[in-house]
């Protein structure tokens, strides 16, 4: 360190970052929560990346020039490997029509897309990622949809529509379906594809405004049953005819979304109600209406894991509504029997606290965690981000009766498997582990199972991020880091705000360190007087005499204590213009607008001098960095040493004590450089209105006037001065800078042509002569040694914000406050503030495997998935044989350490099965494809294992407990799927309101085999209907069909003729009447109606026939033109074709998934052993071993190679040889040969 007494500045490494504030109205919809576990949020033209678990902003992306209007994380619905790694990819769109796809970790733009210059209305990544995982659909105003390749920025196709498009929603069950919400209604597209634009203009339907519905005109004092009945009358809201001009004012539908919890359902959101539509009938089957005094909706998010809705209301309250099961529970008294059967009811199950809404503070958007669906984040216009978590509490069974709601029960499974004895679990892991699935009458037992508890849901606020208040701001960085204060230094930035508070940020973390309410009006300036205290001043609005109330406060950060520095002074006087503290923090100058300046002693708080009335008006002022502290210290030291020598010394021991006393004195002296006993001489210079420079010396309480320098003719009125070493710089109102070299007695004027020089500041650090200059239209950095500009930013040229204040925060970083409400820490080059996330110093570690290098992320996954080579499961990466750089090992260990204790204890629990582990890890990684696969695989491996064990019937209630939820649609068990479809038709039937609807219901009933009910509907056709005769005959036919040969063959002949002549649906119906549903399915498949055929097979065919139909469908899904292999695999899993799935996984090179799947199948005994299977096992295990070797996990490689039998022998030899010679091939060399198929 420095040997001299005077400390010199050392540099501290701070990350470039942006502290953000209030949002712009255009940012309202710019927020998204990705499968990757992070939240992206638009703030003016920047994008914040927030980790919801630790409530930290971990990245800010800056490249947009206009306000960000949409952000969307890419989907993770594909198998991840070294070539398709886990990566943080985000698309953002702005108000000028630009879309940027980001690599979030590096903060770099991956590609930029521009089609038009109007704000992007909506945008989303395609969820089906088998063909490509890079496709992005965007709505370019007014009426275009464009499909982009988000990796290259290439336009694939563009399509225009007749009306203005407001937003769109993809069908989560069918990638070829898309619905557009337009200014006039809805357009349904059924031929969406990445290869070509939709062929037709889509099917248009118009929404009749729900305000004409009885829900809004019900009498105020109606009984609840009456209100419920009124809701039932909201029948049709969808018509194919365009409504008359007076009926359509403006489409006040706020949102349209497909329900991910059940196929072919959609919600429409209006301010006062949510309509649930069944799209097969274009019919309302449920309404969530707000009572007259209730708070209107802004937004709704439908869940996938349960039929539930998260709703955001105008007061910032988030409510969770869960669809009521249609099976009445045994102890439930049905108050309104009609209601129970007539529509879907969404019960309010939980709500969080509202916020205080004002003109400037209102809720903007809510997003929920897509992986677990049990956390919601609310974004408020003032920049606050509130994280609410849903918690389930088991309760006494009687408590629900008071609310009048049927009880909610807990889930039976944890990670897809019933809990074992003493098994650790996380009840709040996800929505489907908190509450059980919705019950289906006739399939599920209405009574809860033995281990199901009644639960209540509550929202808990678990995180809060708050932004800066509204600008303007004044900034001041604390004194710089020096060799003296290095041990206790914190890089603190004080931000004075318009409401009188001072926010102190720690720039290492970017987090708010203290918020102090100091003043009653806007803070005008701040000056630090030590590392832990500062002076700040504020001035009130002038009265009619032009006088104000001045507030000058002394603030101690350690205690939070504030006091008025000028005592009673301050009322009714001219405004303070500036305050300047001397270099050694001994003296303070206070400059007023129309009043002579005051000179104060900072240490004692006493007024040293109030200048005379004739004192010149000050336009700019700066303290000199030179002083006589050094020579004073030398004199003092000499005096002390003289005293010490006069003392007689008893022995040498005493002298050592004495010298330590002296050094203590010196230490004390240097620690308080401005200690009371010593007053060093300091100087300041100032200019008057004529540009004359004055020099004043202050020592103790004596003030001396020094030399005066006449004005420089080339300069205008001087606005600011900066002084460092031998360089003095003056800036004027005309944009001139004048550089004085005091040693060489030279001056040099430079016109910047940028107008008024508002502020100039020298950078800290010994010999650092960089100067930061602020103008009305931007800022520049100058090198005063070379007298040349280093960097520049200008409004309208390279930034779109105005700069309000400037300072240096380290010797090479500047901090700027701007009118978009942000404070930016930038490199000296003043370029974008995005940074590499892996170089950041975070206060709390963040769990996000996507931040790791691709190879390291896969290692972490393999490490968590299975450690069969260990006796116990460890969370310490150093305990396994892992060849990798220590730095990468360290990063992996940081990820492991950042997991919550709950998750760690579950992962280390010996009772956790392989299937549960695979499911849990896919949740932790936010791996959509893995989660889908393991949910279905785990369910059917266990189901087939169970039925193999007990060929006798499955015990009652057991099957019901474990069926897949209806969000898996055709993958569900047939009995459950059938029950759901019957229930659905019953709802449709109650809701029908026209002949069209009745006909559709009768058709569905015939396909489902419900002939009696169908006949009743057919006979309802009125005599004046053109179909009266036809329907009557059909009713007769249905009732008289016998199983006699001749009638069957006649009907079959008629049916096949009908199909051949283009009447497919009618022919299929006839075939179903004579129990020839298998033939019907074949015809449907021949004519390309694959999904309809699968549906019919599930509801009508026995297991063997149904299996044939579904296998053909799976083959079709694998064909190159369809390319939905991942869906085909799920279909095969539901049929128990485990060998086929194992072979597919292996041939698609999903080596990790293949090995773990085959291992699970062998464990549960659902793969019999034969030569083919042994060959598959060997190939899969050896390829997984090679993959593990390539990422450096040698122990794992040995384990799987040894499990591979003959196939693994060669690899085992290679592995033992590398062990013997001690040379391990580097992962990079090994990658290629690890991907060779072993057959």
UniProtKB/Swiss-Prot annotation:
Gene3D superfamilies: YVTN repeat-like/Quinoprotein amine dehydrogenase. GO terms for biological process: cilium assembly; head development; heart development; intracellular protein transport; multicellular organism growth; neural crest cell migration; regulation of smoothened signaling pathway; vesicle tethering to Golgi. This is WD repeat-containing protein 11. Residues 1215-1226 have a biased composition (Polar residues). Residues 1213-1239 are annotated as: Disordered. Keywords: Cell projection, Cytoplasm, Cytoplasmic vesicle, Cytoskeleton, Golgi apparatus, Nucleus, Phosphoprotein, Repeat, WD repeat. SUPFAM superfamilies: WD40 repeat-like. Involved in the Hedgehog (Hh) signaling pathway, is essential for normal ciliogenesis. Regulates the proteolytic processing of gli3 and cooperates with the transcription factor emx1 in the induction of downstream Hh pathway gene expression and gonadotropin-releasing hormone production. WDR11 complex facilitates the tethering of Adaptor protein-1 complex (AP-1)-derived vesicles. It comes from Danio rerio (Zebrafish). InterPro entries: WD40/YVTN_repeat-like_dom_sf, WD40_repeat_dom_sf, WD40_rpt, WDR11. It holds the Pfam family TPR_WDR11. It is found in: Cytoplasm, Cytoskeleton, Cilium basal body; Cytoplasm; Nucleus; Cytoplasm, Cytoskeleton, Cilium axoneme. It comes from the Eukaryota. GO terms for cellular component: axoneme; ciliary basal body; cytoplasm; cytoplasmic vesicle; nucleus; trans-Golgi network. WD repeats lie at residues 63-112, 115-158, 358-398, 476-515, 571-610, 713-750, 752-792, 798-836, 898-944. Component of the complex WDR11. Disruption phenotype: Morpholino knockdown causes microphtalmia, microcephaly, melanocyte disorganization, curved body axis, motility defects and narrow trunk. Morphants also exhibit aberrant head cartilage formation and cranial-facial dysmorphology. Its main location: cytoplasm. The gene is wdr11.
